[in-house]
């Protein structure tokens, strides 16, 4: 003799199969879409949301722990030490100031004495020939 199954899945499947065999057309598809207890899928949606929530929480935890381990692992990297030291900014600033001073040495201002002495005088312009 076969011991009884405590989950009772087989009788549910057999009754569902018998019901769908008797029905035809669109009523069979609507029965297949309906939940087994007729609760319109409220518990199924809750289950899916719980699974997605656990998955998201687990994934977020892994991501944050990985990011933290990468920060701790690379904190003594020479590149990061160089960036944090701000030596490069001071060198850049000194180089930029030297370039500005070098370019200013070549700068000079031409002064038009006629325009300074007689600012009301009209200066003639050349008209382009056609």
From Swiss-Prot:
Residues 68-130 are cytoplasmic. GO terms for molecular function: delayed rectifier potassium channel activity; potassium channel regulator activity; transmembrane transporter binding. Its main location: membrane. It is a single-pass type I membrane protein. Glycans are attached at residue 5. GO terms for biological process: membrane repolarization during action potential; negative regulation of delayed rectifier potassium channel activity; potassium ion export across plasma membrane; regulation of heart rate by cardiac conduction; regulation of ventricular cardiac muscle cell membrane repolarization; ventricular cardiac muscle cell action potential. The modification Phosphoserine is found at residue 103. It is found in: Cell membrane; Apical cell membrane; Membrane raft. The chain crosses the membrane at residues 45-67. GO terms for cellular component: apical plasma membrane; membrane raft; plasma membrane; voltage-gated potassium channel complex. InterPro entries: K_chnl_KCNE (IPR000369), KCNE1 (IPR005424). Phosphorylation inhibits the potassium current. Keywords: Cell membrane, Glycoprotein, Ion channel, Ion transport, Membrane, Phosphoprotein, Potassium, Potassium channel, Potassium transport, Transmembrane, Transmembrane helix, Transport, Voltage-gated channel. It holds the Pfam family ISK_Channel. Belongs to the potassium channel KCNE family. Ancillary protein that functions as a regulatory subunit of the voltage-gated potassium (Kv) channel complex composed of pore-forming and potassium-conducting alpha subunits and of regulatory beta subunits. KCNE1 beta subunit modulates the gating kinetics and enhances stability of the channel complex. Alters the gating of the delayed rectifier Kv channel containing KCNB1 alpha subunit. Associates with KCNQ1/KVLQT1 alpha subunit to form the slowly activating delayed rectifier cardiac potassium (IKs) channel responsible for ventricular muscle action potential repolarization. Interacts with KCNB1. Interacts with KCNC2. Associates with KCNH2/HERG. Interacts with KCNQ1; targets the complex KCNQ1-KCNE1 to the membrane raft. This is Potassium voltage-gated channel subfamily E member 1. It comes from Oryctolagus cuniculus.
